[in-house]
Amino acid sequence: MTRIALLDYGMGNLHSAAKALEHVGATVDVTNDPKLIAKADKIVFPGVGAMRDCMQGMHEAGIDEVVRQAVFNKPVLAICVGMQALLESSEENGGVPALGIFEGAVKHFPDLGHLKVPHMGWNQVYQNDPAHPMWNNIDQDSRFYFVHSYYVEPKQSDLIAATCDYGLQFCTAIHKDNLFATQFHPEKSHTAGLQLLKNFVEWNI
């Protein structure tokens, strides 16, 4: 059975993510222990809330370097602020440095007129590469659940695995080698979200 380290650095409710991963067949360790993370087959890097708190929580838990190393040697799924933290910086709070694994920045939604920010609720996701194993058995334009005021803007367009429209078209998933990341919350996205988590559990790289 696939053993997944679900990173716990004080950001958000990990219960729903842990239960969803267990539901699709994973053994889950909710942990910030570098030794357990190193032993895991795969890593899920969640995150909700503010980027500054996210970066501070990782640093205080001593797992920022663990994450930097993990993305090069085992399958990683980053979710919401976890995905945003992979880029170089965020506009939040006047500018917050992030992990810098990928070139690019995290931008705040502009004034979208009649559309409210944060972007909260269900929205369609367009898969740039439906053949990617993480999209197995997920229909094009399936709906996923979002809660965010910021979105990622990677410098390399070939990192973009999916997009979404909310007043503007924005990147909602990125991928490179053994890493996949989503702005939406698969653990809150019912059938399509559970399928994506199942695909991650079964993803052989």
Curated annotation (Swiss-Prot):
Catalytic activity: 5-[(5-phospho-1-deoxy-D-ribulos-1-ylimino)methylamino]-1-(5-phospho-beta-D-ribosyl)imidazole-4-carboxamide + L-glutamine = D-erythro-1-(imidazol-4-yl)glycerol 3-phosphate + 5-amino-1-(5-phospho-beta-D-ribosyl)imidazole-4-carboxamide + L-glutamate + H(+); L-glutamine + H2O = L-glutamate + NH4(+)
Subcellular localization(s) per the UniProt record: Cytoplasm
Chief location of this protein within or outside the cell: cytoplasm
Gene Ontology BP annotations: L-histidine biosynthetic process
CDD domains: GATase1_IGP_Synthase
Gene3D superfamilies: 3.40.50.880
Involved pathway(s): Amino-acid biosynthesis; L-histidine biosynthesis; L-histidine from 5-phospho-alpha-D-ribose 1-diphosphate: step 5/9
Example of a GO cellular component annotation carried by this entry: cytoplasm
Subunit field text: Heterodimer of HisH and HisF.
Purpose: IGPS catalyzes the conversion of PRFAR and glutamine to IGP, AICAR and glutamate. The HisH subunit catalyzes the hydrolysis of glutamine to glutamate and ammonia as part of the synthesis of IGP and AICAR. The resulting ammonia molecule is channeled to the active site of HisF.
NCBIfam families, per database record: IMP_synth_hisH
Name of protein: Imidazole glycerol phosphate synthase subunit HisH
Organism: Acinetobacter baylyi (strain ATCC 33305 / BD413 / ADP1)
Originating gene: hisH
